[in-house]
């Protein structure tokens, strides 16, 4: 029964294949089945020509294949050695075929064939993918890794030379592939699109930017012989005064340079009393010395334009004043200034000095060589008219009888304490203990020399007897308050008269008052006593009449009236106890040079009461306000005694 065997064999094979294909997916999903996970057929493959169906159902198999021949002996022969390659169509075995073909291409020759040798099949570079194509002949499809396909190579020597034409790359389905590869050596302009141009942060940029390649240019060698390549020295550069003029050619006529070595002019005298002491200007000092140069100039007013570029000076000779050999050549530039000569009709350039080293110091800021001409006169601004200068007499014009009086002065080391309160009266200060006599001079218009000499015993007697007449004091008051003032148009004669008047007053007071202890007047901060060894200061200036002179006269009168109207004065020390201190104060210089009062006290001292006469007669009683102020001053003096020098210090 051969048909039965064949049917059995067929049914067994079909059942095996059916059983294998039905359970292969579930076993593969679990992964832990004791059965075979890969559905491999155990039947001999020599007689099974039909490929297994993709679906495991037997009814879906293709029925065009003929059944196998009946062979009962081979149908049950299950050989363990079977081929792994299944008998399927090339479309289903593409992965296996790819593996075999790749292994074969490893030993192929590395040389790339020419373009004309490549395959020109029309279906090679098709736009559609392979899984969408439907061809009747599937064996004609070539995989990407086949041996006849161009593969990548690192050997660039095998590449052929391509023309430098900029033709676009040919599309697929073209027969010619000559210009397939583009030249990579030539630069090309690229159009880059800036994606940030649409953002609001960059509203001004254009969307397209043209990037150009730099043109190839050889590196140029620097030409050191070019005239612009030479560095400019310091002497050729323009300084503070501008660029220097060109060097003078001795063949051409030049201008006469004014020398700055002339002696300085004498300073202008501020008062006519010092005109005799100053040297008279001579004709040589008025006209500056002129040093002759090479030749006279035909056009002295023309100067070269300093803004034009200087020409080359290699063919010219040396400058007019050659510098010393030790000077640096870069610092041989002369400064040119205009001299302020009153006799010159035009300005002429002149050199400061011939030595370039000294000239360099002047350019660098040397104090003695700043570059100013010698005929410049320094003039100080005049002082304000409100000041009262102190006129100190010259040493040669002081008379001899004034020396003993000044030698007996004692300014002591007692500072004058002042205490200004907030009370409304006119004068508020603390009266010090009366030191020795003092002589000083004040010059508002002319010369007003005042000397005070009061006897302490007479002052004590007048303080005890307030109703006693004071003829001597009245005489002195009259002589002090009615000093004759010279006219302002003759200051020199006024000075002589004032010095003679001061000499007479000092002689009369020396004879009448043997005791040297006299109260001096109050000295303001700008009034200093005339000491025998002091030098006269600068020459005082004549001032116009001002109300300050009237206030000074009022102050002097009030000082004398206060001595007359005060009924009680502080007790004066005995001559024996005060002799040693007065002798030391007369012989030794003062330790504290007479402290001046503050400005607020001066304003109170030199301010006159409105509505009062600035020149009151000696017999006229003082005003009521002034009497109250002096009485308050006396009470404050009695309440606060004067301390010694050690206590004050």
Curated annotation (Swiss-Prot):
Polar residues bias (residue ranges): 268-279, 504-515
Coiled coil: none
Record field: compositional bias (Low complexity): 524-533, 540-550
Residue ranges with Basic residues bias: 330-349
Listed Pfam families: Tymo_45kd_70kd (PF03251)
Region spans: Disordered: 28-80, 257-286, 311-359, 458-550
Family to which this protein belongs: Belongs to the tymoviridae protein p69 family.
Protein's name according to its UniProt entry: 70 kDa protein
UniProt lineage: Viruses, Riboviria, Orthornavirae, Kitrinoviricota, Alsuviricetes
